[in-house]
């Protein structure tokens, strides 16, 4: 049997909710009887709590009306920690990072950025835990985290980091991707591009260009968002009455010519969708070395619309993510969590757009 909740615990809870604007100035606190029933305590216990809050100038009890919050909030400046390790590999995280920093200058929060943006995924893995621990020790008000990818045991490490932040009672918003805990419900807010739609859009584009068979190429230990893109591709291909099976999935190093050779390419009828632009750029070079002509034998495209994409030998068709909006909505969700960190988790998927270039058009 659970122990009786003390009046101090109830007092601390209500006071915290007032300070976090769960009960903003001018709002009514729950009736004493309602709160007594919620906490399974007597009505005089709640009356004692409300009297203490009134003595501190946080509320005003009015007979026949109720208890009104009178506390006027000051312009609190929050401190948020950034854990965006992908900024060392992809431009999208640099854009998201810059937007968060830009908004911090104009908003009511400051950002701590410890980095972990090294080009090597393994180095980022070594750094990320210490940065997370640093943020927790500094008692930041919230954390933005883009889960690690491209390293072994990334799933376990991501879950470990999220759990540590959660146990510290710090609000957390995941950016760009979820952590792999399916089929369990994710306990955190997530903001990303709509990856299922991104897969569907790219598949439809290549099919419309005359491709009769599509392949998907990605590197080992890629992010969970890859699964959603694959699902979107499969859905679109099957809607067109064609097959997309495990034989169309290639997980490996795009520099490995022997592995690249395993892809069945029917000249003028094959399209390759890569997990990102960096994979596509390397794969284009490998295909060229094998005598496979882009725009003649095969079409190819990627994701993230990196700056160099339009400067490749064959300018690369890509999918542009709404990076600045991802950052903006992430801030909104973290501010929401500051008011009540127990709110039901939200997943927001934003629309991106395809940027069509030479690499996805047969000549």
Q: Where are each of the predicted segments found?
A:
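Short acidic capping loops at alpha-helix termini that bridge into adjacent secondary structure
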Residues: 25-27, 213, 244-248, 293-299
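N-terminal helix-turn-helix
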Residues: 27-61
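Flexible loop/turn connectors
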Residues: 13, 187-188, 260-363
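Short, solvent-exposed amphipathic alpha-helices that sit
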Residues: 91-107, 198-201, 224-243, 282-286
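An alpha-beta-alpha
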Residues: 200-242, 346-361
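Short beta-strand elements in bilobed, periplasmic/extracellular small-molecule ligand-binding domains
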Residues: 105-121, 215-216, 234-256
């Amino acid at each position: 049997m659970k122990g009786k909740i003390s009046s101090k615990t109830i007092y601390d809870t209500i006071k915290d909710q007032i300070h976090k604007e769960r009960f903003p100035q001018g709002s009514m606190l729950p009736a004493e009887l309602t709160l007594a029933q919620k906490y399974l305590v007597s009505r005089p216990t709640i009356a004692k709590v409300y009297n203490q809050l009134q003595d501190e100038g946080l509320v005003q009890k009015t007979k026949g009306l109720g208890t009104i919050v009178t506390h006027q909030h000051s312009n609190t400046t929050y401190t948020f920690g950034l854990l965006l390790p992908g900024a060392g590999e992809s431009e999208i995280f640099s854009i998201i990072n810059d937007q968060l920093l830009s908004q911090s200058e104009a908003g009511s929060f400051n950002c701590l950025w410890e980095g972990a943006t090294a080009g090597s995924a393994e180095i980022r893995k070594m750094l990320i835990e210490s940065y997370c621990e640093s943020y927790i020790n500094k008692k930041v008000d919230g954390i933005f985290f883009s889960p690690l990818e491209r390293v072994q045991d990334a799933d376990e490490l991501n879950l470990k980091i999220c759990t540590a932040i959660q146990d510290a009672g710090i609000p957390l918003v995941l950016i760009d991707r979820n952590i792999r805990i399916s089929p369990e419900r994710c306990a955190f807010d997530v903001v990303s591009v709509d990856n299922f739609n991104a897969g569907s859009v790219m598949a439809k584009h290549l099919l419309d260009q005359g491709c009769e068979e599509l392949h998907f190429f990605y590197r080992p230990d890629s992010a969970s968002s890859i699964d959603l893109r694959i699902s979107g591709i499969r859905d679109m291909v099957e809607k067109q009455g064609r097959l997309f099976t495990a034989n169309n999935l290639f997980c490996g190093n795009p520099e490995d010519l022997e592995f690249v050779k395993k892809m069945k390419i029917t000249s003028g009828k094959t399209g390759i969708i890569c997990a990102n632009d960096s994979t596509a750029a390397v794969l284009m070079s490998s295909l060229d070395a094998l005598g496979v002509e882009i725009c003649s034998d095969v079409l190819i495209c990627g994701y993230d619309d990196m700056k160099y994409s339009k400067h490749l030998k064959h300018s690369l068709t890509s999918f542009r993510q709404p990076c600045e909006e991802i950052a903006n909505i992430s801030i909104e969700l973290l501010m929401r969590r500051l008011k009540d960190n127990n709110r039901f988790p939200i997943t927001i998927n934003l629309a991106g757009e395809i940027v069509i270039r030479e690499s996805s058009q047969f000549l």
